[in-house]
Amino acid sequence: MATLQVDVVSAEEAIFAGEAKFVTLPGEAGELGILPGHTPLISRIRPGTVKIVRADGGEENIFVAGGILEVQPGMVTVLADTAIRAADLDEARAVAAREKAEEALRNAKDKADIAVVEAELAMLAAQAVAARKLRQTRNTH
């Protein structure tokens, strides 16, 4: 079966590099599914989970807080603002951080502070949802 090279990187580190059969991720206009030979594409990525079905059939799940996607017929590159391996996601910590950010939003004085906190809240909410979905998936298998 044909595969494609997938690279997921953040400013901190390379999270994944390898061959895959299939990739799904949250694109700006909705969920994207990418197979080998996909039409070239550049898109923004919304916060959510990148699911990679490796060439060996295993799966990698990576939370991204947004970023840029580049697709070429044999390659997918995800340049993430922040990327966290599913195994490292902590739903309780994300919920606690979201509560702290909500408090900061209530105390924000100017539009710039409000915009920064709102972006952080959106990312933390998506992270909590991703952690919950991944936990539920693990519990059903």
UniProtKB/Swiss-Prot annotation:
Belongs to the ATPase epsilon chain family. Its main location: membrane. GO terms for cellular component: plasma membrane; proton-transporting ATP synthase complex. This is ATP synthase epsilon chain. It is found in: Cell inner membrane. One of its GO terms (molecular function) is ATP binding. The keyword Transport applies.
